[in-house]
């Protein structure tokens, strides 16, 4: 079978469990990017299965996700008005960023997206914090636990956990309080414990699994739409993500939305 860049495929050796897009081909090797999970991979061409799936289906699934969350959030708009928290989303992947920004728009949230390489986040993040003055900041992109590595406690054994951790630390220099600025950090298989120790309110990945492209955005949206100074049910919040507490975790956190009266 002849494959080309842009084709949607699955991998036979992994029981065709995840959907990827081919982003490059060299000789007999295809370089892949996950459609739903924040994951890069490579594969021999003869291990790939072509998938005739339209990306419009994924957009429909995202809209269904929005509808599901909106039904969970009961806001009395007859007498009260609401000012949700502002979101700053830094993402190492342009496609995932665009998908998350579309998600925020569907949720009627004020969100600013920055496509930036993970290695540059530490140096650049303060500039964006000062410009947008967010209530919630997301630090994400791509990550993975390196092949052959054994110690899951060391950031050096991850593709980008060190970059995410340093960006979180820089953010905490800007705002020390975990109540005033909510940080959501990490990507697939990230070093969860180090991100939490660095100052993140929420992070991936407790069980070092892959996370869904929208998981950080789901948490950010629910925090943005929860009343300020009211603690959010942590377990319920985490379970709203695609893989639950295996993929995302965090600390008890209050919402960022102001509630006003009269409307």
What label would you give each PLM region?
Residues 28-36:
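Short, solvent-exposed secondary-structure boundary/capping segments
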Residues 1-14:
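Short coil-to-beta transition motif at edge beta-strands of beta-rich domains
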Residues 36-81:
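Intrinsically disordered, low-complexity, charged/polar segments
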Residues 16-27:
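Short beta-strand-centered aromatic/proline hotspots
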Residues 129-142, 200:
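Proline-aspartate-enriched helix->loop->beta-strand connector
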Residues 163-211:
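Catalytic cores of nucleophile-dependent amide-cleaving enzymes
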Residues 207-263:
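C-terminal functional extensions of proteins
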Residues 101-112:
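Short helix-loop-beta junction
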């Amino acid at each position: 079978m002849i494959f080309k860049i842009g084709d949607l495929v699955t991998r036979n050796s992994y029981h065709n469990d995840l959907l990827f897009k081919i982003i490059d081909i060299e000789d007999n090797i295809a370089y892949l990017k996950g459609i739903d999970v924040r994951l890069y991979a490579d594969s021999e061409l003869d291990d790939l299965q072509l998938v005739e799936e339209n990306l419009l289906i994924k957009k429909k699934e995202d809209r269904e996700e929005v509808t599901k969350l909106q039904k969970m959030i009961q806001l009395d708009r007859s007498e009260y008005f609401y000012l949700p928290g502002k979101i700053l989303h830094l993402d190492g992947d342009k496609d995932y960023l665009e998908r998350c920004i579309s998600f925020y728009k569907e949720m009627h949230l004020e969100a600013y997206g920055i496509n930036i390489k993970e290695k540059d986040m530490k140096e650049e993040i303060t500039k964006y914090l000062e410009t947008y003055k967010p209530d919630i900041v997301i630090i994400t992109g791509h990550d993975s636990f390196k092949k052959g590595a054994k110690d899951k406690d060391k950031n050096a054994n991850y593709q980008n956990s060190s970059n995410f951790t340093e960006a979180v630390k820089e953010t905490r220099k800007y705002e020390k309080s975990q109540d005033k600025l909510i940080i959501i950090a990490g990507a697939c298989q990230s070093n969860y414990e180090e991100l939490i120790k660095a100052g993140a309110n929420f992070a991936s990945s407790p069980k070092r699994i892959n996370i869904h492209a929208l998981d950080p955005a789901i948490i950010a949206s629910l925090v943005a739409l929860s009343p300020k100074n009211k603690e959010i049910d942590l377990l319920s919040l985490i379970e709203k993500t695609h893989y639950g507490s295996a993929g995302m975790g965090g600390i008890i956190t209050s919402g960022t939305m102001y509630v006003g009266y009269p409307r």
